[in-house]
Amino acid sequence: MSVMFDPQAAIYPFPPKPTPLNDDEKQFYREKIKRLLKERNAVMVAHYYTDPEIQQLAEETGGCISDSLEMARFGAKHAASTLLVAGVRFMGETAKILSPAKTILMPTLAAECSLDLGCPIDEFSAFCDAHPDRTVVVYANTSAAVKARADWVVTSSIAVELIEHLDSLGEKIIWAPDRHLGNYVQKQTGADVLCWQGACIVHDEFKTQALTRLKKIYPDAALLVHPESPQSIVEMADAVGSTSQLIKAAKTLPHRQLIVATDRGIFYKMQQAVPEKELLEAPTAGEGATCRSCAHCPWMAMNGLKAIAEGLEQGGAAHEIQVDAALREGALLPLNRMLDFATTLRA
């Protein structure tokens, strides 16, 4: 008897935390990375959720700090022949799909994502086959194989608009892998959405009880929430959006204190945007509960200075992203559909 994969029941082992570096070691690796970037004709692209010192280095070396899609876009347009992707593995894959001629290096290929892990291709493909009348929309936080099985790829920044568009065409949707984001777009659009039941281990930990207590301590604070969070958290929010949208909301909201319900890595760029405001972490533990991620992705934390230097210096199978040519072609189609759709939204 076969047992259907249950993303909600899956427990993913966390990687060990990187060994802390002292100030001299940090300076040594910073200088080494700067030298290696020049020698390899490389540029560094980092996600908002990496540690502040990694984002700072990306800025100092002319790189990019953004969400996964903009990271890949930046890399595709940049003249560098090599991209150093500080993030998790699917981000490196997306960069390779959009820039096949470039060398894509990562500090470690073991930097996973619970959304990616929670959507294995064989089980997901069978799920799609069981609902052949539905259009398959997958979040960017998926493997190249899952993207290749989809009709559309989407980021949180345009998810609502895309589902509205598909709903206007009378299409029924399979959404994967994040159930919270899928439920959010369904409620925003009223579309017929069948959700795969994955979740982000960071956002899934935000707790309403603890958040309510924090709001009592800071009654004048606005709450900014990423839509990968549970519905009960989203319903408390003053602003809901992707990483880039939350940074914009921090600038436009009049509140002097902001409670932020997403990975705390975003605080680096958000504080730059609003230096006069106080940023507060939304709690990830409730009554009698403890947190596993504690508002920081453990795989993002693998992108340390030493690992980045090793990735640039060593390259090879331990650090270079490869995507099968057939998979790349399959994944490029839904990615390009998304890019074209995003362009029409800006027009």
Curated annotation (Swiss-Prot):
Pathway(s) it belongs to: Cofactor biosynthesis; NAD(+) biosynthesis; quinolinate from iminoaspartate: step 1/1
Superkingdom, natural source: Bacteria
Localization: Cytoplasm
One Gene Ontology term, aspect cellular component: cytosol
Cofactor: [4Fe-4S] cluster
Catalytic activity: iminosuccinate + dihydroxyacetone phosphate = quinolinate + phosphate + 2 H2O + H(+)
GO BP terms in the entry: 'de novo' NAD biosynthetic process from L-aspartate
Pfam families in UniProt: NadA
Residues the entry annotates as binding [4Fe-4S] cluster: C113, C200, C297
EC number: 2.5.1.72
Cofactor note: Binds 1 [4Fe-4S] cluster per subunit.
Main location: cytoplasm
UniProt-annotated binding residues for iminosuccinate: H47, S68, Y139, A140, N141, S156, H226, P227, E228, T243
Keywords from the UniProt entry: 4Fe-4S, Cytoplasm, Iron, Iron-sulfur, Metal-binding, Pyridine nucleotide biosynthesis, Transferase
Cross-referenced InterPro entries: NadA, NadA_sf, Quinolinate_synth_A_type1
Family: Belongs to the quinolinate synthase family. Type 1 subfamily.
Name of the protein in its database record: Quinolinate synthase
Organism listed in the record: Salmonella agona (strain SL483)
Organism classification: Bacteria, Pseudomonadati, Pseudomonadota, Gammaproteobacteria, Enterobacterales
Gene field: nadA
